[in-house]
C-alpha cells in the first residue's frame, strides 16, 4: 500500500515536470492593442526577429488595421504600428515577442495577462483573462493584439491560447 502511494506521487511529479516547464507571469512587458475583429483569427504567434515582425505587419496591416493612431479615442488604445516601433534588430538579439490575437463579441471587454508556460515537448500556452468593467457590454465585435515581451524563445513546436474569465 505504501509503495504504490509513493509510486503514485513519483509519477505525478514526473508528469508535472514533463508537461510544464516554467510559467512566466506579469513581470513581462505587455501591451494590449485594440485592432479590427477578424473571424477565426484567434491564436498565438512568436516573433524572433525584426524581419519576422515587419513581415507580420505588412501581411496583416489592412486585415487588422495595424497602422498608427495619432488620436486615441477613449475606448481604444495606441495603434499597433506605434506599439512595435521599439522592437528593432538590437531588441531581437536576446529577446522575442509573443503576439496573442484575440476575438471578442464585445468592444467593452478588456483583458488581463495571466502569463505563459512552455512544456517540455515545446508547446507554449498564453493565458489571458477577459473582463468587463461594467454591468453591460456592447454588441460590437472587437479584435485585440496582445504583445508580450520575453527572453528569446527557441524550439517552440506549437502555440496555444487559453482564455479565461467571461469565456469559462
List the model feature ranges, each with a label.
Residues 6-8, 18-168:
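Exposed, flexible binding/inhibitory loops of compact, secreted disulfide-stabilized domains
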Residues 1-12:
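N-terminal Sec-pathway targeting helices
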Amino acid at each position: 500500500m505504501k509503495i504504490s502511494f509513493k509510486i503514485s506521487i513519483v509519477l505525478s511529479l514526473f508528469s508535472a515536470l514533463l508537461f510544464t516547464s516554467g510559467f512566466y507571469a506579469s513581470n513581462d512587458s505587455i501591451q494590449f492593442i485594440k485592432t479590427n475583429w477578424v473571424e477565426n483569427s484567434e491564436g498565438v504567434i512568436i516573433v524572433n526577429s525584426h524581419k519576422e515582425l515587419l513581415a507580420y505587419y505588412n501581411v496583416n496591416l489592412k486585415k487588422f488595421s495595424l497602422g498608427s493612431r495619432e488620436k486615441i479615442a477613449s475606448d481604444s488604445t495606441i495603434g499597433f504600428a506605434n506599439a512595435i516601433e521599439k522592437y528593432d534588430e538590437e531588441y531581437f538579439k536576446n529577446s522575442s515577442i509573443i503576439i496573442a490575437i484575440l476575438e471578442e463579441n464585445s468592444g467593452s471587454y478588456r483583458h488581463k495577462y495571466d502569463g505563459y508556460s512552455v512544456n517540455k515537448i515545446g508547446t507554449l500556452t498564453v493565458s489571458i483573462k477577459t473582463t468587463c468593467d461594467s454591468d453591460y457590454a456592447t454588441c460590437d465585435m472587437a479584435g485585440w493584439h496582445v504583445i508580450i515581451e520575453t527572453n528569446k524563445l527557441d524550439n517552440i513546436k506549437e502555440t496555444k491560447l487559453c482564455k479565461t474569465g467571461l469565456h469559462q
